[in-house]
Amino acid sequence: MTHTLDDRTELLRELLERQFTEHTDQLTELTLQSRQREHGGHDPDTLRRLVEVAQRGIADTAQALRRMSEGTYGICEGCGQDIPTARLEARPSARYCVPCQQRS
């Protein structure tokens, strides 16, 4: 089955929206754990790092969704070329093609 560009974009949008929800849920859970006496079984430094990862995931996903609405999603911010679909499927929030990512 072949997908049109619009179909693939819609699938990637759905994936990004799911990831946004997952990151938000994770951040909520980690925030609740941080308020517990035992920090949900995590030491405070690990919990802080997990919160930072969840926050970064929310920000990256939100930026990708913003780029979709602006029509710039899938365009490398380094070279201006299209980011290959396989890369976007593997990392939907990608801002760079692989060569530009490796240079940064």
Question: Where are the language model's segments positioned?
Answer:
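Cys/His-enriched microdomains
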Residues: 56, 74-77, 95
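Short functional micro-motifs and their immediate structural scaffolds
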Residues: 73, 84-85, 102
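Cysteine-rich micro-motifs
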Residues: 93-103
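Interaction interfaces in information-processing and related assembly proteins
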Residues: 1-70
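Short metal-coordination and nucleic-acid-contact micro-motifs, chiefly zinc-binding Cys/His arrays
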Residues: 69-72, 93
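Acidic interhelical loop/turn segments
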Residues: 36-40, 78, 84
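Short Cys/His-rich "knuckle" micro-motifs
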Residues: 86-90
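Short, cysteine/histidine-rich loop/knuckle motifs that typically chelate Zn2+
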Residues: 78-79, 99
